[in-house]
Curated annotation (Swiss-Prot):
Lineage: Bacteria, Pseudomonadati, Pseudomonadota, Alphaproteobacteria, Hyphomicrobiales
A molecular function GO annotation: structural constituent of ribosome
Entry GO CC: cytosolic small ribosomal subunit
Assigned keywords, A-Z: Ribonucleoprotein, Ribosomal protein, RNA-binding, rRNA-binding
Stored Pfam families: Ribosomal_S17
HAMAP family, per the entry: Ribosomal_uS17_B
GO biological process, one term: translation
Protein name: Small ribosomal subunit protein uS17
Quaternary structure (record): Part of the 30S ribosomal subunit.
Amino acid sequence: MPKRVLQGVVVSDKNDKTVVVKVERRYSHPLLQKTVRQSKKYKAHDENNQFKVGDFVSIQESAPISKDKRWVVLTSEAAG
């Protein structure tokens, strides 16, 4: 089964070798007939501490690295 890849924005880089990535998804609400934005934060492994707050990154699912980390940062995307 392929590993999931998500895109999001780094919102915290205070932990060693860890960044917190906020991933936003949009969906149509069945009753309100509106587009709703929902976000979720994922802790992702950043081996070299190279990503900073505000960077747009791709994260990939991985085997558990710690209690909360199950994602690895792949690449930094051009924000835009």
